[in-house]
A protein has these predicted regions:
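Second RecA-like catalytic domain
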Residues: 1-24
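Acidic, glycine-rich low-complexity segments with interspersed aromatic residues
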Residues: 17-145
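Compact mixed alphabeta submodule
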Residues: 139-170
Length: 170
């Protein structure tokens, strides 16, 4: 995968087709034989865990940002992707009112933050890389395409409150 490369991410997944609608097929390029499909159905998507000599890990955690929704009543926050400087600020997963740390995806990222930043090498080597995608428009469609924006480790985590115009709650 190359930074900026756009993949077709259709509703009906197909691991065998290399190209769909003139774009590289996400499911073909992320195919892990004998494992579940690699999906981007929510904001935070861990790949199915596998066992290696050191234990059980998720090979990677994929995040998905939807810039076309920035500032909407549903998503008042904004993710920042500055791939030329190697910096991404991802806002997590919490559209609903409630404790954001109870959300599965946020909980996974907080756990990974602790692993990525551990002083203990044995713990750190169990870290899952974070892989970043943005949903983009292509072929006249707003959905069904994702752009690879790189991978990284978590260096900072903070709790941030945004006003939800839809529910009128902070």
């Amino acid at each position: 995968m190359k930074i900026g490369q756009v993949f077709r991410y259709p509703r009906d997944k197909n691991r065998k087709k290399k190209m769909i609608d003139g774009y590289d097929n996400f499911s073909y390029y992320t195919n892990c034989p004998n494992n579940k499909l690699v999906l981007l159905e929510s904001g935070i998507n861990p790949i199915q865990k596998v066992k290696n000599k050191d234990g059980v890990i998720s090979p990677a955690i994929l995040t998905s940002s939807s810039p076309h929704k920035i500032g909407s009543s549903d998503t008042p926050w904004q993710d920042f992707y500055n791939t030329s400087k190697g910096h991404i600020r991802y806002s997590g997963d919490n559209k609903d009112v409630g404790d954001p740390l109870r959300k599965k995806g946020n909980k996974i990222l907080v756990q990974q933050f602790e692993i990525h930043n551990s002083n203990n090498y044995e713990i750190r080597k169990m870290a899952s890389p974070i892989i970043f995608f943005k949903r983009v428009a292509a072929n006249g469609a707003l959905k069904g395409y994702v752009e690879f924006n790189g991978f990284g480790v978590i260096t900072n985590a903070e709790m941030k409150v945004e006003h939800n115009r839809k529910s009128k709650v902070d």
